[in-house]
């Protein structure tokens, strides 16, 4: 197997891990490649990057292009962090996506976000995948609601 093929497999594996986690966290098994995540009715494009060494600007440009191709105004890039499980991956929220999320945030839920890093080059917000899942779940507990199970 070529090195490029192995990289592609690693990227796909990381993508699957991210969506498996988001499916579990939000209790929605239909999220992923063809089904989009939504927040306050707005679709959110999530692009994953397993390569922790990839330059941030390159990742953001690629994620922005993918979102634009899908006519999505809110988008984020999820970057793997070497040595961390999937929940410790970094979610990069660009200023334009943050602005749109803020416009939709009538309940001021975004006030509950604690950035790992803010203003990394022109206002880029960085949170963990766990925090991003909490935001997408309106700060409700993550995972299946066991009180509903029989």
Residue ranges and their predicted role:
Residues 33-38, 112-113:
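Short linear loop/turn motifs
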Residues 20, 25, 40, 45-101:
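Catalytic cores of nucleic-acid endonucleases
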Residues 1-33:
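Acidic-basic catalytic patches of nuclease active cores, encompassing PD-(D/E)XK
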Residues 80-150:
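Domain-level recognition of nuclease-like catalytic cores that cleave nucleotide substrates
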Residues 13, 27, 32, 71, ...:
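Short, flexible coil/linker elements and helix-boundary hinge sites characteristic
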């Amino acid at each position: 197997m070529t090195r490029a093929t192995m990289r592609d497999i690693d990227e796909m594996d990381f993508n699957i891990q991210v969506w498996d986690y988001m499916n579990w966290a939000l209790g929605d098994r239909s999220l992923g490649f063809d089904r989009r995540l939504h927040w306050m009715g707005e679709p959110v494009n999530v692009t994953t990057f397993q390569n922790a060494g990839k330059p941030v600007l390159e990742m953001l440009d690629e994620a922005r292009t993918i979102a634009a191709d899908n006519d999505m105004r809110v988008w984020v890039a999820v970057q793997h962090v070497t040595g961390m499980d999937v929940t410790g991956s970094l979610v990069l929220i660009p200023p334009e996506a943050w602005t749109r999320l803020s416009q939709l945030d009538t309940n001021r839920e975004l006030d509950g976000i604690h950035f790992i890093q803010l203003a990394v080059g022109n206002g880029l917000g960085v949170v963990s995948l766990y925090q991003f899942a909490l935001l997408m779940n309106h700060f409700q507990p993550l995972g299946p609601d066991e009180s509903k199970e029989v």
